[in-house]
Amino acid sequence: MKKVLIIGAGFLQDFVICKANSMGYETYAVDADPDAVGFKHAHHHSVIDIVDEKACLKYAMENCVDGVLTAATDYGVLTAAYVSQKMSLPGLKYKVAQLIKNKYEVRRCLCEHHVDDTEQTYEINRNTDVGYLTQILSYPVM
């Protein structure tokens, strides 16, 4: 039986755990919440923070998983990519996962490649001159 690690075991990942079970996979789940709903359905689970890449990798290696994924959360994307890359499993490259986690970079990339209707992107931080920015923006903004 193939083993799959699901990064996250909350309400939004529970469906994935149940689906993997129904497809015949042996499911492993990690989540920082000891009462995560998905733990009830996973064959195996461990209370591990899903942003702790090294701890998740250790758990995956100890259990010789054949695949790793996350669903419906940005928090587990980097960890899933990290684990899959370190274990030579199929998955997102870590650099792609980093891009996905950075909403500004996603919007900038989409804008540069004319993938959506974004015509302007700005990254805002504590050093941003908001007064100047309000003058140059095209409205409405989101």
Regions found by a protein language model. Name each.
Residues L99-M142:
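Active-site nucleotide/adenylate-binding loops and adjacent lid/helix of ATP-dependent enzymes
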Residues M1-K95:
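ATP-binding N-terminal substructure of ATP-dependent carboxylate-amine bond-forming enzymes
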